[in-house]
Amino acid sequence: FAAFYADCRHEVLPIASGYRLALIYNLIRVGEGPLPQAPDYGDQQTQLTRLLADWDRSGSLPDKLIYPLEHAYTEAEIGFAALKGQDAAAAQVLIPAAAAASCDLYLALLSVNETGWAEYSGGGHWRDPEFEIGEVSYSAWTLHDWRRADGSLSEMAALPFTEEELSPAEALADLEDAEVEFSEATGNEGASFERFYQRAAFVLWPSDRRGAVLAAGGLGVSLPALRDLIRRWEAAGATEGDAGWREAGQLASAIRAQWPQASWLVRQASSGGQSADLIDALLRLNDVEGAAEFTTERVAGGAYGPEDNPALAALCRRLAPEAAAGLLGQIITAHAFCRPGACANLLARCAAEGAIALPLLQGPAQLLLQGLPDDGPASPTAPQDYSQRPEPLTALQLAELITVLVGIDAALADQAVSFLLARPALYDMDSLLVP
């Protein structure tokens, strides 16, 4: 006979012969007397506190560490209060040690989701062939469903992780044993597989590395976290220089440092409003200089679209007039050819909201007129990248352009009208100019 506690890990194999009897008991402690006490882990806690406090000094550790747990937990039950056996004992040591060493500690679910191509192994019946894993084409390693040590939920989005962050290094040695679901070939698709593995884990990092950890998770993780930090800082009185302001500023700096580099991700950040979100966050933190630097590097020097204009106009209102006009000129010079409508709207916003005095807008307005798409021999060659080709002006955008030019300098407006009328192939009289 063999007996197990229900929450102990054990393996049950198919019966080769005979029968299996299962007797299930609920064990309840009765009677008076002192409750059993957990062992004293004071020495281990002291040692762990010292190791965590030396995290930054070692120089060899990643920004976060992941300690997978022994027992299985579902999304519904995961929580520090629900930990069992060795996991509860580990939490008893980790919680005070992390607090003493100024580390953030979370409980999360660790998931590995892999898909790819499967190969026939040559075994099995022709009606029920056997497969084996061939090539992994997609792999996602994420941490999600976060819980704090006080039992509260965290709204932090999923974070990616790597094997180098696991402690111990072989903690996921049983990943290869995870159940694999194979799908037979259909049509033009070959045989495929999907493997899903999930386990609970402690996740911790030094509090002063929080910004780097969140920024590494991508804009979908870091920007919501930044907005939450700023919201809490503003609710606490918005005192510039206090701990909340410094924490939000550190995260904003980390986001700037890890801004996407791939051109398609940069465009996605602009069209998705994430560039505008960061500019807005920097302005709320009174980091006008940082917002201007980001705009020069990532907007004028990267991707730009109409979604950026409200934040850019707000930035121009906070800058010195000459600096605002110069920044506006940089954006228009870089993007007037491909985004003429967005540039006209930004110019109109700055004029209407008084962000820049009208005399100072003459330079940016002239740059916009010079940068408009042209069908003449001096016209810039259309980029091979389709996403960077000129966006045709709409009738409303054209009306906005002429209106703002009239307000800035009537002579510029006359030049614009003459320019447009002379290029009917680009600026159709019936669909654009007459309306």
What are the language-model segments listed below?
Residues 18-33:
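A short hydrophobic beta-strand segment most commonly corresponding to one strand
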Residues 1-9, 15:
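Conserved metal-binding segment of the jelly-roll/cupin
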Residues 7, 18-20, 62:
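Eukaryote-biased feature marking scaffold/signaling PDZ-domain proteins and nuclear chromatin regulators
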Residues 5-7, 24-28, 70-72:
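Structured loops at beta-to-helix junctions and adjacent beta-edge loops in soluble globular domains
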Residues 29-435:
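Intrinsically disordered terminal extensions flanking catalytic oxygenase cores
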